[in-house]
Amino acid sequence: MNTPVIGVLALQGDVREHLIALAAADAVAREVRRPEELAEVDGLVIPGGESTTISKLAHLFGMMEPLRARVRGGMPVYGTCAGMIMLADKILDPRSGQETIGGIDMIVRRNAFGRQNESFEATVDVKGVGGDPVEGVFIRAPWVESVGAEAEVLAEHGGHIVAVRQGNALATSFHPELTGDHRVHGLFVDMVRANRTPESL
């Protein structure tokens, strides 16, 4: 049985919606708040919320270093909105004391779309997701200013990069979990499934 166990970092943000989307994409989904829970999952989703708050809570719960270690070790990880910011190697406009987990060689701008439009929906063509374009919900969303050579741009909107993949790390500016379209989560579940060693099956 090749059903991956995927955690959702449950420190802040729309955790429940991600749990539902992952289950719909044929994964076993569970909340992760502590290092011992992180150790038990095959992959992790970092949900939207407020990136500064997530950073502070990750430190408070003793999660920041275990998260960095697992991501460096190749654990598949998917970040949406604030989660995208957490996976960036660099933030263009960080708040004081704000730290990231890193994992994707990209520079992000926090709340970039929010300056123009607090929240909106838009269709986005995402590389690797078949069929119709994905309906993306952007809520005070970041965008990616630039990516390094190792990072692959999967989608753009309005001339800005909104989805990126580097190895086992995936990030989107938008919230696919809020639309009922679970294809982006399906892409991530496939990434997790492909990463699992035969011994772990």
UniProtKB/Swiss-Prot annotation:
Enzyme Commission code(s) on record: 4.3.3.6, 3.5.1.2
Enzyme active site: 81, 175, 177
InterPro entries named among the record's database cross-references: Class_I_gatase-like, PdxT/SNO, PdxT/SNO_CS
Gene Ontology MF terms: glutaminase activity; pyridoxal 5'-phosphate synthase (glutamine hydrolysing) activity
Record-linked Pfam families: SNO
Pathway(s) the chain acts in: Cofactor biosynthesis; pyridoxal 5'-phosphate biosynthesis
A Gene Ontology BP annotation from the UniProt entry: pyridoxal phosphate biosynthetic process
Record field: catalytic activity: aldehydo-D-ribose 5-phosphate + D-glyceraldehyde 3-phosphate + L-glutamine = pyridoxal 5'-phosphate + L-glutamate + phosphate + 3 H2O + H(+); L-glutamine + H2O = L-glutamate + NH4(+)
Cellular component terms (Gene Ontology): cytosol; glutaminase complex
UniProt: L-glutamine binding residues: 49-51, 110, 139-140
SUPFAM superfamilies: Class I glutamine amidotransferase-like
Keywords from the named record: Glutamine amidotransferase, Hydrolase, Lyase, Pyridoxal phosphate
PANTHER family, per database record: PYRIDOXAL 5'-PHOSPHATE SYNTHASE SUBUNIT SNO, PYRIDOXAL 5'-PHOSPHATE SYNTHASE SUBUNIT SNO1-RELATED
Family: Belongs to the glutaminase PdxT/SNO family.
HAMAP family: PdxT
Quaternary data: In the presence of PdxS, forms a dodecamer of heterodimers. Only shows activity in the heterodimer.
Protein's job: Catalyzes the hydrolysis of glutamine to glutamate and ammonia as part of the biosynthesis of pyridoxal 5'-phosphate. The resulting ammonia molecule is channeled to the active site of PdxS.
Protein's name according to its UniProt entry: Pyridoxal 5'-phosphate synthase subunit PdxT
Species this protein is from: Streptomyces avermitilis (strain ATCC 31267 / DSM 46492 / JCM 5070 / NBRC 14893 / NCIMB 12804 / NRRL 8165 / MA-4680)
